[in-house]
């Protein structure tokens, strides 16, 4: 272990030496740049662009370009980047993560690589965690970029499509991570290219990169729409039932946070709902509602996992930042179950139209870089998943903060009494204090205790996040006491007020350890910026979540000896700190494994999504007649259908083929059994294809002109693809939920998901081609003028009143296995198509 640590330290030192060498080159241009007039310095941007177009690389331009930004920053902002900031900028340009301590000027550091990469003209995205930071940084740093001749845009959720398009077309675009993801998904749902807002993804520089790429890695971005409303009564009935249960009726697995009914609970459910067998196949839907009601009532906690807003809405609380996640809803009916639990109006369930995780979203950029003060603990994950190195950057001034050893108490009550006493003592001498909590519930409790102790304070949590920046900016003033959940206020510096340095600087008090050492380090990092004095102290108890789930038995046994004598006994030792960090490492390892597994599952969706989105883009941007593609689709559909029917008895086979042709391919009076009964199957394919081409030409002839033909073709394909893709996403979600059970049968769930997901994707492609064929050949096309200016599908869809909504008389198929493909040619299994009634 010692040798490994020594190697890591030596590697870091080697990187710092390389970066120092490049930084000195940049500094070597300082006098030359200082001698330039404003006009000459501004002209450097066009010069660099021309040199880049003539073959010089961005690496070639780096020393001089960084020097230009440095001098421009001094003239425009009154700030001159230090050497360590130049070094951080070089790391960012190389697509890695410079670990820079709080207060070291990450925002200014980013200006140099952002400017350099914007010279290529392909767009640079500066990504922040919230709109306040995006607007603040775009306004402050935008002044510098504009002075240098680069355009700057801000992409906010409230902006219209045209405003978003304008922002993305700028050289530099500031946005939140969520909005970039949603814009990407929405772009792949439009019908016309001119309705897209993004350019191809080039270079993203992510602020607080660990928050976005690690903490939120498992959170999918989902674009969804309403589906047929499930009766709200079932949610209420399930909720009423689980509230009648005692603790003996269900079992909770604390480490995994899962819950299930015991036998006594099952008996009560069968009595309550008047059932013979709760787990009969007919009761699958009911068990789903009961499972969600159990989770809502006994796993999901008010003010920790969610809050109830003044508008009577359930808002999810981000477990890492303590902020509410506006617009997000728990999936699979859990949100509705919580709404029933809390007695607020139940909103309709929704159907996923498109989704993507941040992991796969940001891996699509040509180059990805990020900034943070705490990433070294997650170095393996950044390297393995994002191919990014973590390079620690030296501080401009030595860190003067004092980090005290943890204090461990036997109970929560004793711990909180000690916290309040410490805060009161420091407040009375004028030292500012920032109290960090993990949950809204804890911040409210400490706030009440401080009120009782007569200590004035501010509270920052998910309930009043709108005052975040103002509260944090005042947190360093003399006598200030601020309570904040987790890393609320991250990205806003806490500057010390007059006379505070002499009192020891800002004291950060953590009320419990987080699962991740990185989050604890972020809290500590609020104090001691730019060489300022400061302190940090963590208070723990044996009843804390981390200690309860993962704490060492040695610590518990050691503390038990003192509890009987004194309930306020406290332990302070290096052994304790080591034990806590050991527990955190175990949790971090578990979380990393989980995120890695999520990525393995999501990679299946990613590969399929990229194929579908690439095909969509090709259709949207096509300015050609799509007849060759549509005719090829018709041909493959005919071949697939005839091949699947050729396995049957000859008479039954011909009847099925004829039925397919009449209901999906041709006018009914244009083909009969007499036409195909003497032909072999290859000749039948040729006959049907020739007849289909004639029918295709008849259909197209009804349209007004070539433009109308192209519009009809595009909307037809996109409408079918989008409908099938949406259904496929839901099917994959259901597969993912069920495939875990296959592990009990000694099958690897991920391998099962990959193979089954691939088969389902192939089936979906067949179903898309079948529906395109049927809709093209059977649509009632009206010869009418259509408005060219419309931006929605509605006008074009009026020309596709396809008979896909009409159910023709079901044909009768014999000797078809339940898992065989349906002979009708839909691409679905027989049990899920025409065999549904039979099975």
Curated annotation (Swiss-Prot):
**According to the record, how does the cofactor bind?**
May bind 1 zinc ion per subunit.
Which is one Gene Ontology cellular component term of this protein?
plasma membrane
- InterPro entries for this protein: Helicase_ATP-bd, Helicase_C-like, P-loop_NTPase, SEC_C_motif, SecA, SecA_CS, SecA_DEAD, SecA_motor_DEAD
Question: Could you say which EC number(s) this protein's record lists?
Answer: 7.4.2.8
Q: Which GO terms describe its molecular function?
A: ATP binding; metal ion binding; protein-exporting ATPase activity
Tell me a GO biological process for this protein.
Answer: protein transport by the Sec complex
Q: Which reaction does it catalyse?
A: ATP + H2O + cellular proteinSide 1 = ADP + phosphate + cellular proteinSide 2
Topology in the lipid bilayer is annotated as: Peripheral membrane protein
Primary localization class, coarse: membrane
Where does the record place it?
Cell membrane; Cytoplasm
Q: Which residues bind Zn(2+)?
A: 822, 824, 833-834
- Region Disordered: start-end pairs: 782-818
Task: Specify residue ranges for compositional bias: Basic and acidic residues.
Answer: 782-794
Similarity section: Belongs to the SecA family.
Task: Name the HAMAP family on file.
Answer: SecA (MF_01382)
Query: What exactly does this protein do?
Result: Part of the Sec protein translocase complex. Interacts with the SecYEG preprotein conducting channel. Has a central role in coupling the hydrolysis of ATP to the transfer of proteins into and across the cell membrane, serving as an ATP-driven molecular motor driving the stepwise translocation of polypeptide chains across the membrane.
Q: How does it assemble?
A: Monomer and homodimer. Part of the essential Sec protein translocation apparatus which comprises SecA, SecYEG and auxiliary proteins SecDF. Other proteins may also be involved.
What is the protein name stated in its UniProt record?
Answer: Protein translocase subunit SecA
| Gene that encodes the chain | secA
């Amino acid at each position: 272990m010692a040798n490994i640590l020594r190697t890591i330290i030596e590697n870091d030192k080697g990187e710092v030496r390389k970066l120092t060498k490049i930084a000195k080159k940049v500094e070597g241009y300082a006098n030359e740049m200082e001698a330039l007039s404003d006009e000459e310095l501004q002209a450097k941007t066009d010069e660099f662009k021309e040199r880049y177009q003539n073959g010089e690389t961005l690496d070639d331009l780096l020393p001089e370009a960084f020097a230009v930004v440095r001098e421009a920053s001094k003239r425009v902002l009154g700030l001159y980047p230090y050497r360590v900031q130049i070094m951080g900028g070089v790391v960012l340009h190389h697509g890695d993560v410079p670990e820079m301590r709080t207060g070291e000027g990450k925002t200014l550091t980013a200006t140099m690589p952002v400017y350099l990469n914007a010279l290529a003209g392909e767009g640079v995205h500066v990504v922040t965690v919230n709109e306040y930071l995006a607007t603040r940084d775009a306004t402050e740093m935008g002044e510098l970029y504009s002075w240098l001749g680069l355009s700057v845009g801000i992409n906010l959720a409230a902006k219209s499509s045209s405003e978003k398009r304008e922002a993305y077309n700028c050289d530099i675009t500031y946005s939140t991570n969520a909005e970039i993801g949603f814009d990407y998904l929405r772009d792949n749902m439009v019908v016309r290219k001119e309705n897209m807002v993004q350019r191809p993804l080039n270079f993203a520089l992510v602020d607080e990169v660990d928050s976005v790429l690690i903490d939120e890695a498992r959170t999918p971005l989902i674009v969804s729409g309403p589906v047929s409303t499930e009766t709200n009564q079932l949610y209420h009935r399930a909720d009423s039932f689980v509230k009648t249960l005692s603790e003996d009726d269900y079992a909770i697995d604390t480490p995994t946070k899962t819950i299930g009914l015991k036998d006594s609970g099952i008996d009560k459910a069968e009595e309550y709902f008047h059932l013979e067998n709760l787990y009969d196949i007919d009761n699958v839907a009911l068990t789903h509602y009961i499972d969600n009601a159990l989770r809502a009532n006994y796993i999901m906690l008010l003010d920790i996992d969610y809050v109830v807003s003044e508008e009577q809405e359930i808002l999810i609380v981000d477990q890492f930042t303590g902020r509410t996640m506006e617009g997000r809803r728990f999936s699979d009916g859990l949100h509705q179950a919580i709404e029933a639990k809390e007695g607020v109006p139940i909103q309709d369930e929704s159907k996923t139209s498109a989704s993507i995780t941040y992991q796969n979203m940001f891996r699509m950029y040509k180059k990805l870089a990020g900034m943070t003060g705490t990433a070294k603990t997650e170095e393996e994950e950044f390297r393995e998943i994002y191919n990014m190195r973590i390079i620690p950057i030296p501080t401009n001034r030595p860190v003067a903060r004092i980090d005290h050893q943890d204090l461990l108490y036997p109970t929560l009550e004793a711990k909180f009494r000690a916290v309040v006493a410490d805060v009161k003592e420091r407040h009375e001498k004028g030292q500012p204090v920032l109290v960090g909590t993990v949950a809204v519930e804890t911040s409210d409790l400490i706030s009440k205790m401080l009120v009782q102790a007569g200590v004035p304070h501010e509270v920052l949590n998910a309930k009043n996040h709108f005052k975040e920046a103002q509260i944090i900016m005042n947190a360093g003033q003399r006598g200030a006491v601020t309570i904040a959940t987790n890393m609320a206020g991250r990205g806003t510096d806490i500057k010390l007020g007059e006379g505070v340095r002499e009192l020891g600087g800002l004291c950060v008090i953590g009320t419990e350890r987080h699962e991740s050492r990185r989050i604890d380090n972020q809290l500590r990092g609020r104090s001691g910026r730019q060489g300022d004095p400061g302190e940090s102290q963590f208070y723990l108890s044996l009843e804390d979540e981390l200690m309860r789930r993962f704490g060492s038995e040695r610590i518990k046994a050691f503390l038990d000896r003192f509890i009987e004598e004194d309930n306020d006994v406290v332990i302070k030792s290096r052994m304790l700190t080591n034990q806590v960090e050991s527990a955190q490492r175990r949790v971090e390892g578990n979380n990393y494994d989980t995120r890695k597994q999520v990525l393995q599952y999501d990679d299946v969706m990613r590969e399929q999504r990229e194929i579908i989105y690439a095909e969509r883009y090709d259709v949207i941007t096509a300015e050609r007649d799509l007849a060759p593609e549509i005719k090829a689709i018709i041909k493959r559909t005919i071949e697939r259908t005839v091949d699947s029917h050729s396995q049957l008895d000859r008479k039954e086979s011909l009847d099925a083929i004829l039925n397919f042709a009449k209901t999906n391919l041709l006018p009914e009076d244009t083909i009969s059994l007499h036409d195909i009964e003497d032909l072999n199957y290859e000749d039948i394919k040729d006959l049907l294809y020739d007849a289909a081409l004639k029918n295709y030409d008849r259909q197209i002839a009804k349209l007004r002109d070539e433009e109308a033909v192209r519009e009809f073709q595009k909307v037809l394909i996109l409408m079918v693809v989008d409908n099938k893709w949406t259904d496929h996403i839901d099917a994959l979600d259901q597969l993912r939920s069920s495939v875990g059970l296959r592990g009990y049968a000694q099958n690897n769930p991920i391998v099962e998901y990959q193979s089954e997901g691939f088969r389902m994707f192939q089936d979906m492609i067949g179903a898309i081609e079948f529906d395109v064929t049927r809709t093209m050949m059977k649509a009632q096309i009206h010869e009418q003028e259509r408005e060219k200016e419309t931006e929605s599908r509605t006008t074009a869809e009026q020309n596709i009143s396809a008979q896909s909504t009409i159910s023709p008389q079901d044909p009768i198929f014999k000797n078809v296995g339940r898992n065989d493909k349906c002979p009708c040619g839909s691409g679905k299994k027989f049990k899920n198509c025409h065999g549904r009634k039979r099975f």
